[in-house]
UniProtKB/Swiss-Prot annotation:
Domain of life: Bacteria
Binding site for Fe cation: 6, 9, 39, 42
Pfam families per the UniProt record, alphabetical: Rubredoxin (PF00301)
Coiled coil: none
Organism: Chlorobaculum tepidum (strain ATCC 49652 / DSM 12025 / NBRC 103806 / TLS) (Chlorobium tepidum)
Function statement: Serves as an electron acceptor for pyruvate ferredoxin oxidoreductase (PFOR).
Keyword Electron transport set for record: yes
Name of the molecule in the record: Rubredoxin-2
Alphabetized UniProt keyword annotations: Electron transport, Iron, Metal-binding, Transport
GO term, biological process aspect, one: alkane catabolic process
Length: 52
């Protein structure tokens, strides 16, 4: 699975681990994240992420 990097703070979203603090289970692809999901570090929206 592809990882995505926040352009604001550098946080890496890894689908293999998900976002436990945001109740996003492991195995959730970036594309499957709800539109309301935000970076857990800086609060940026999905539009601020770039595939790496």
């Amino acid at each position: 699975m592809e990882q995505w990097k926040c352009n604001i703070c550098g946080y890496i979203y890894n689908p293999e681990t998900g976002d436990p603090e945001g109740d996003i289970p492991a195995g959730t692809s970036f594309e499957s994240l709800p539109d309301s999901w935000m970076c857990p570090v800086c609060g940026a929206g999905k539009e601020e992420f770039t595939k790496i």
